[in-house]
Amino acid sequence: MQNNNPCGLDGFAFLEFSGPDRNKLHQQFSEMGFQAVAHHKNQDITLFKQGEIQFIVNAASHCQAEAHASTHGPGACAMGFKVKDAKAAFQHAIAHGGIAFQDAPHANHGLPAIQAIGGSVIYFVDEEHQPFSHEWNITSSEPVVGNGLTAIDHLTHNVYRGNMDKWASFYASIFNFQEIRFFNIKGKMTGLVSRALGSPCGKIKIPLNESKDDLSQIEEFLHEYHGEGIQHIALNTNDIYKTVNGLRKQGVKFLDVPDTYYEMINDRLPWHKEPLNQLHAEKILIDGEADPKDGLLLQIFTENIFGPVFFEIIQRKGNQGFGEGNFQALFEAIERDQVRRGTLKELT
């Protein structure tokens, strides 16, 4: 393994979800275009696929997934990282501060693993070590196009104030993640700091979010989720207009964006060449730099899908940012949603 990539990382292998009501998770993923392609032979565990994305819904009892759901409600209870050699990656992780994790025997994934944020787990996945590899009844081996979602782009961690350095150090010391972006976002009433980390392979990106006050959406998440964890998951598409239109038809709800946002796009990005009417109709956000060579990014955020967890749909047209130019507009949109829901009082 290369020194700069000590665990031999090569992207996300899967995300695992659990919750008090697994039917809601099944329904939500089906609405998003995922297809159940395998079921565990002995446990209530289902594998959903779309494009290269693998979501496992784990409703087994007396195991880590159930414990995570009892603490946090519905959410992502584990991540699988693709590596060249799962055993070697695990040994490196333990030697650099990782704490080994072992699930109950009946729910064992058959993968080396370490403890991660908020009682979640990171599993190491290679060609020989696949989750529940001999335990699946496979119902479909056909590729799943669904709504055109192709891969996991990034996911965020919401952390307690003062814990950002702790989790940045966790990912740096074990996996050699580096800071690739830093944001200081101020809404009208609340604010947050975000530090985006990137893996040596360039395929795993994890922004860490920390609140600057008691009322922000980060604090609301930590309160409702009963702790730190994965706040949102960004999924790639090659045609965001088609994907979003399809998701809306399936009943997926997205955050509203003020009309004034679209009036400013041509001034912000005069070179963009995107269909403005279509952007506006689907409420898709656009971002880029002054120089067209840095490319464009198109993105949209769902409302909270289960608990305080939501999804982002993202299409990268050469831009590797996170939509920094949209953060302000989005942050204020979420503040308006908080005011509507009564969790934030509007300043008068």
From Swiss-Prot:
CDD domains: HPPD_C_like, HPPD_N_like. It is an enzyme of class 1 (oxidoreductase). The keyword Repeat applies. It comes from the Bacteria. One of its GO terms (biological process) is killing of cells of another organism. Its EC number is 1.13.11.27. Fe cation binds at residues 154, 232, 312. Keywords: Cytolysis, Dioxygenase, Hemolysis, Iron, Metal-binding, Oxidoreductase, Repeat, Toxin, Virulence. Binds 1 Fe cation per subunit. Residues 11-141, 151-303 form the VOC domain. Pfam families: Glyoxalase, Glyoxalase_5. It catalyses: 3-(4-hydroxyphenyl)pyruvate + O2 = homogentisate + CO2. Its cofactor is Fe cation. One of its GO terms (molecular function) is 4-hydroxyphenylpyruvate dioxygenase activity. Belongs to the 4HPPD family. PANTHER family: 4-HYDROXYPHENYLPYRUVATE DIOXYGENASE. Catalyzes the transformation of p-hydroxyphenylpyruvate into HGA. Has hemolytic and brown pigment production activity. This is 4-hydroxyphenylpyruvate dioxygenase.
